[in-house]
Regions:
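Boundary at the C-terminal end of the N-terminal hydrophobic targeting segment
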Residues: 29-36
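Catalytic zinc-binding patch centered on the HExxH motif and its immediate surroundings
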Residues: 71-85
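Extracytoplasmic and endomembrane cell-envelope/extracellular-matrix remodeling and assembly machinery
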Residues: 36, 41, 47, 69, ...
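Catalytic Zn2+-binding segment of zinc metalloproteases
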Residues: 101, 111-128, 146
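Active-site recognition of the HExxH zinc-binding catalytic motif
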Residues: 89, 105-113, 117, 179
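Bacterial N-terminal signal peptides
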Residues: 13-27
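Membrane-active amphipathic alpha-helices enriched in small hydrophobic residues
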Residues: 131-146, 151, 155-167
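Short pre-active-site segment immediately N-terminal to the catalytic Zn-binding motif
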Residues: 91-105
Length: 363
């Protein structure tokens, strides 16, 4: 199911079902009780992720499909894989990463889970655990019936559940270690430094501690341990490939775009004040002024950006969105047509143009 968010213009999808991944919280959910996640479709961000992921999948000998990339509307630091080699990246990961090397490390780590067959193995382990859980419930019921004591049943079931949890999490830690090792090899093959992966892991660890979460693999979906960071420190020392000196302009634009669409306008303008005349900052300003309905300011900045980069399809897409959202359908069609001419294979641009066409000619 898809719908258009009338505030951001991003396409949002809701996916319901059991995501069989390394997420601990999904480990004990049934198909019926699994939570929904909100997804965002954005051509510019997905193109960036595709450029990052394609060489990693190639190095891992995994078929690449752009449609396997999903952006999760969640500001936490996380990424995970699902069935069918689907890659899910949280918006928080993109917004809080310092550079594309950190994103490459995250994607390489998740690709390591695919290489290790961890999704299928996790499914099998969960099925086995469900059978054990059912057996413990039956045993507890039998004990209660035989002794007349309900506490006997509770003790049996609690003991079984505790053992299952410990076994599951110990297994998960081993999977994370395996994925780290595979990721370092993939980064080596693609001539990228593992420094970003190390730095991002440290970022997660710092955030956990700031949030009052002690390092405890029993309550983390991707447990950060001193051993893992030490392993990556060693990998960084041995790697012949340096980390990028600074983030690319492309990555900075994506961070600015996501921030401008998803964060509070006041926070966005603190991050990207009007005094900042860089392209990423002005991109963010154009978006946030649009959200604040300061359309003249938004279009003035956006027209300047288009004058500087007339062949940038994403600037034309944004201008089309502004016109579309404010009921100016014909100019919206013109901008969407321009964006599509610059990026003719974009399914999202085709949808934008088709929607504008329907609005312009409803009959």
């Amino acid at each position: 199911m898809e719908k258009i968010n009338r505030i951001t213009g991003f396409f949002r999808k809701t996916v319901t079902g059991l995501i069989c991944s390394v997420l601990l919280q999904s480990a004990f959910l049934s198909d019926a009780s699994a939570a929904s996640i909100s997804l965002i479709s954005d051509e510019e961000t997905e193109q960036f992720l595709a450029r990052q992921l394609r060489p990693v999948f190639k190095a891992a000998d995994i078929p690449f499909n752009r449609n396997n990339i999903y952006i999760v509307n969640d500001d936490s630091l996380n990424a995970f894989v699902g069935d069918g080699n689907n890659m899910f990246v949280h918006t928080g990961t993109l917004m809080k990463a310092n550079d594309e090397n950190e994103i490459a490390g995250v994607l390489a780590h998740e690709t390591g889970h695919i290489m290790g067959g961890h999704i299928l193995r996790q499914k099998i382990k969960l099925q086995n655990m469900q059978q054990i859980s059912l057996a413990s419930m039956l045993a507890g019921g039998a004990a209660a019936a035989a002794t007349g004591r309900a506490d006997a049943a509770i003790a049996i079931m609690m003991g079984t559940q505790s053992s299952m949890l410990n076994a599951m999490l110990a297994y998960q830690v081993e999977e994370e270690r395996s994925a780290d090792e595979s990721a370092v090899k993939l980064l080596q093959k693609t001539e990228q430094s593992p420094a970003g992966m190390r730095n991002f892991m440290k970022k997660i660890d710092r955030q956990n501690r700031l949030n009052g979460i002690a390092e405890n693999p029993y309550f983390r979906t991707h447990p950060v341990t001193a051993e893992r960071i030490s392993f990556l420190n060693n990998a960084v020392r041995q790697s012949p490939f340096p980390a990028p000196a600074q983030p690319s302009n492309e990555f900075l634009r994506i961070k600015a775009k996501l921030s401008a669409f998803m964060e509070e306008p006041r926070k966005v303008l603190q991050k990207y004040p009007p005094s900042d005349k860089s392209t990423p900052a002005r991109y963010a300003q154009a978006i946030v002024f649009f959200r604040m309905l300061k359309l003249n300011q938004s279009l003035k900045i956006l027209n300047e950006l288009i004058a500087e980069e007339p062949e940038n399809p994403y600037f034309h897409e944004l201008k089309g969105q502004i016109f579309m959202e404010t009921g100016k359908i014909k100019p919206a069609r013109t901008e969407y047509q321009k964006a599509l001419s610059l990026l003719p294979n974009s399914a999202l641009f085709q949808i934008n143009l088709a929607q504008a066409g329907l609005e312009d000619n409803p009959n």
